[in-house]
Structures are given as C-alpha cells and as structure tokens.
C-alpha cells in the first residue's frame, strides 16, 4: 500500500481505471489526471507505507465539463458534473492516442447532485446522487445511455440510499456503493 500525493488544492472526486492507467478527477483545475498503473505498482513495491508526491508524474487533460465523477466504459471516459439546482451533464471522451488528447464525443443531461457513474456489461447506466450527510442519497438506474439522454428525470428504477453514497462500480454483475456514515459513536473510558 502506498499513498500518492496529488494536487492539494483540488477536490479529487472520482477515479477510474482503463486497464493501463488510473484517471482522477481534478475539479480545481477542470481537468482529469492520468497516472500510469505501472508507476503505481512500482511505487507500492518500492515505497510501501509511504506517501509519494505524484504531482510531477501525472498527465493533465483539460475537459469541457467540471469533473466530479468518472468511469471507463466502452473505450470511453465518462465524466459527470455535480450541480445542486439544475440538471448536470455528463460527457463521453475518447483518448486520441496519436495526439494524446481527450476528444469530447457526446454530451448528456443528467440529474442534479450526481456523485458517481458506472455501467454494467449490458450497457445499463447507474448514477449515484448525494449531497450532504443529513439527506438521503439516490441510485438511478437506466436501461441505456439513450434512455438516460432522452429521459434523465425518469430512470427505470430509483432507490433511496443512506446519506453520502457517492462513487459506485459494477464488477461481476454486482453493484458496489461505498457508504459514508455521518457519525460513529465509540465508548470512551473516563
């Protein structure tokens, strides 16, 4: 285990893996940062238990929407923007390997307060919405990107979740959602 130090000014809100690289949202710089997975493995091996300053080894890619959460699906980076009062947006990007630049392909309206996005192998889209530790979070399930694009306020299923349910991922037909709790009370000795 190693900790990588990133941009200290940013809210690093999302992370994705494309098979070769780890991508991290940097909302402060309005970009996503790419870190080679080989570098991460090397640092974990050589610097176990340490904090490694990785600011100089990341590649920054500017994006047209403020990155709040991110996923990799179908050869694309899907980057969503969190807003409070109006519909947010999600943009699908393609990495042009010749120019090493992200190319925006499609732009979608999505519900407000989106903090996580993922897809399953069938193309179903899952969005996690959350704001604060005292309000319920919601999981929105759509049959496809087309269903999301045409009816963002009408998911196939909407599930109430505990507060602060944010990032999510699908692996082996199982949806994983880490949940943060507002408080943990432990007994103390006086």
Q: Each predicted region: which residue ranges?
A:
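Surface loop/turn motifs at the tips and blade-to-blade linkers of beta-strand repeat domains
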Residues: 3-7, 59-63, 106-110, 157-161
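Conserved blade-ending motifs and adjacent loop-strand segments that build the rim/top face
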Residues: 149-169
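Conserved small/polar residues in nucleotide/adenosyl-binding loops
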Residues: 182-188
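Conserved beta-strand positions in repeat-built beta-propeller and related beta-rich domains
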Residues: 24-28, 79-84, 127-133, 177-181
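Repeated scaffold domains used in trafficking and secretory/extracellular systems
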Residues: 9-14, 63-70, 111-118, 162-169
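Residue-level detector of Asp-centered blade-edge/turn motifs that repeat once per structural unit
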Residues: 17-19, 72-74, 120-122, 170-172
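Loop/turn-rich, solvent-exposed surfaces of beta-rich toroidal or solenoidal domains
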Residues: 109-144
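Short loop/turn segments immediately following beta-strands, especially the blade-tip
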Residues: 37-47, 93-100, 144-149
